[in-house]
Amino acid sequence: MAALVAATFIPLKADDNLKAMTEQHEQKKLDVVDGVKMYRPFESDGQMVISDYVDIANKSKADIFVSSLMYFVERFDMETEYIEAFDDTEGTFIINKVYKSVSDKNNLLAKKDDVEFNCKIAFKSSTNSIVFRAYDIVASYKDMGVMSKKADLAKLCSSDKEKLKSFSEKYILMNSSLIKDLVEFIEKDNPQKVTHWSTIAANDVVQGMNPTEVKLSLGIPETVRTQGTKDTWMYSNDYVVIFTSGLVSRIIK
């Protein structure tokens, strides 16, 4: 897991963008694909971004923040995805996210439509709601199935080529599906209280931390072994965390 540092949330920059987001929020319930509410891009500071807010009833700012972080920590591809920065006081964090649309490797004809999207997504937690902003969105694909190319979301959306336009729709659907899944997770989750934020920011572990805090600091362990009231989490041969009755009692490194 990449080191976590203080994050500056990337806000909407102008009143017209706030208006665009609000109008989109009112209209998006009419824009549904495969049961997913679609969040559409708009221009902000010369690039296409996707930003909106989602209401989450009966959830505190702290719970939404911790649940959101845990959602990504437990699902990341650790080779390419990570939490870039966070600020526990403000309830904000930024992730580096990769979406892949890959066809059957045996279907060579379909391979030409394979695409990978890299982006950053900033989140801001508040009582009963979460705001997100996806930006720096870039698609990587092969032109004619051979030559590697890249295009940002603005180019995809404005292109006359059906292939590139289809890529923009793929990204919008994948990102919207992620937000839907995240919100459903937050609604059902009952997160543990997190207090060791400075230790987490240093990617360290100390006695007294709970499992959620250790995951936020180190990620998911390679193996877990339970014996009575003791749980042993092995991150490597040189890094082992032992819990007794749910709290860290020993660190071997």
What does each model-found stretch correspond to?
Residues 1-19:
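Bacterial Sec-dependent N-terminal signal peptides
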Residues 191-253:
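Residues within mature, well-folded domains
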Residues 6, 46, 87, 113, ...:
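A generic structural signal for short, solvent-exposed coil/turn residues
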Residues 15-192:
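Ser/Thr-rich, low-complexity intrinsically disordered terminal regions
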